[in-house]
Amino acid sequence: MLLAIDIGNTNVTLGLVHGEAIIASRRAATRATSTPDELELLIDGLLHLDGASFSDVTGISVASVVPALTGVTLAVAERRSLQLLEASSATMPMPIRVDRPSEVGADRLVNALAVGRLYGTPAIVVDFGTATKFDCVARDGAYVGGAIAPGLELGVEALAVRTARLPRIELKEPERAIGTDTTSAMQSGVVIGYRALTVGLLDRIKLELGRTEKVDLEEIQVVLTGGLSAGPWARGLLGVDAIDPELTLKGLTILWALANGSPAVADSPTVGWAGSAAGSIHIISERDK
């Protein structure tokens, strides 16, 4: 089975993949100082929660935005004699039309790959994580950029840490915009205000993408993902076609399948390009030692 790993600033998310289907997923807090031993123990423990072990894993597909943990994951793969595919601008089987492709986060590229294959193009992915990321995919499947805003929980934390009297609050949908105490006022500002930020930026991005791609705005697929995408603040957004919390794991699965020549994935009709990343990926196996 394939082990898909999404290493974010807040969480490490694992997906256990059989064939091309995610059969289990787990999430743990990110520790940027983890050693190979610690990460191996974490992964092994999460696998055991679903009755699996490292002996069931045939390869690892990883997207990491934490450079320190990228190398640690590589060390774990070497130790376990597993093939490892690291998502990056160099391993993406799609055009990346931005000024500096190497600066684009691996998770953003993987999401762009997944949305094109699974939902069609043109498309916008909104990823609710530590940061909220908006990523655009052109009609031909190319990644063409996006926007990054502070994440919802980051805003809550900043209010608590950077002010003298504002408390940490629970993220919940307020009953009204006009709060009658500090907590309800903060919930209004954070949740309703955050939704307004998302909708406003999404509308502007959709308008620009529609103009560039010469399509009606209704043709642009909008997909939400990320650890906070299942919250009430996300469900209340207008103009969203799908909420897919496992989009990144699915993208890592697709990337692996393409790199290994899966006919089912390579023949996907949803975008204007097809092909394999084989030959450009960083693979570690027993033969390389």
Name what the model sees in each region.
Residues 38-50, 197, 201-202:
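Short, well-ordered amphipathic alpha-helical segments that serve as non-catalytic structural scaffolds
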Residues 54-65, 83-84, 213-227:
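Short glycine-rich phosphate-binding loop at a beta-alpha junction
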Residues 47-52, 56-78:
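Phosphate-bearing ligand-interacting subdomains
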Residues 74, 81-162, 191-206:
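Phosphate-binding/catalytic loop of phosphoryl-transfer enzymes
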Residues 2-4, 30, 158-289:
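ATP-binding/phosphotransfer module of carbohydrate and carboxylate kinases, centering on a glycine-rich
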Residues 2-45, 142-167, 173-176, 184:
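Short glycine-rich, Thr/Ser-proximal phosphate-binding strand/loop in the N-terminal lobe
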Residues 2-6, 59-61, 123-127, 221-223:
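Short glycine-aspartate micro-motif
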Residues 68, 90-91, 226-230:
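Short, polar loop motifs at secondary-structure junctions
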